[in-house]
A protein has these predicted regions:
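Structured helix-beta-strand junction loops
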Residues: 27, 56-57, 77-78, 121-122, ...
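General N-terminal targeting signals
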Residues: 20-22, 47-49, 77-79, 98-100, ...
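Short amphipathic alpha-helices and their capping/turn segments at secondary-structure boundaries
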Residues: 20-21, 64-79, 111-123
Length: 156
């Protein structure tokens, strides 16, 4: 089974996703695919909170800022996978190096293909994404490209 959770920032999506991934696992291995590459103290604090939330839930954390399928090559496909988050994964693919100032034109396609391949390879997966489309603000070209790319990936 594949489950997609989308919503506003910091509203409990990850906690819900953890509960669902545990239920889906039915005693099988649980994997938490952590996609955030921390850039500052706020990111590190969020990572600490998420780790504390998972404490006792028996998730094996797989750090996969990019190339998810390569990162899980030794994982059990019958296990339960929680990918948190599609939003961070897309950012990592669009800007693959810390100094990248222009988005990689193939980043969104690569991200989408990785996620579709993950769906094909594993039995159960829960995907977390941020809903960033409802504020009605017109953004610069880079941000609009990111928003369009995330919407395209979320629909997959």
């Amino acid at each position: 089974m594949k489950i997609f959770i989308s919503g506003g920032c910091k509203n409990g999506k990850s906690s819900l996703a953890q509960q669902l991934a545990v239920k889906l696992s039915q005693g099988k291995k649980r994997y938490y695919l952590a996609t955030m590459i921390p850039c500052d103290g706020e990111d590190l604090a969020r990572i600490r909170r998420h780790r504390a939330d998972r404490d006792g839930l028996e998730f094996e954390t797989v750090e996969a800022g990019r190339n998810i399928c390569a990162a899980i090559k030794d994982c059990d496909p019958a296990g339960s996978y929680l990918l948190d988050s599609v939003t961070a994964l897309l950012l990592n693919e669009l800007y693959p190096t810390p100094t990248a100032s222009e988005p990689d034109p193939d980043g969104a396609l690569r991200c989408r293909q990785e996620l579709l391949e993950l769906c094909d390879r594993v039995e159960n997966a829960v995907f977390v994404s941020d809903y960033i489309y409802a504020d009605g603000i017109a953004y610069d070209a880079y941000t609009e490209n990111y928003r369009r790319s995330l919407a395209w990936i979320d629909r997959a």
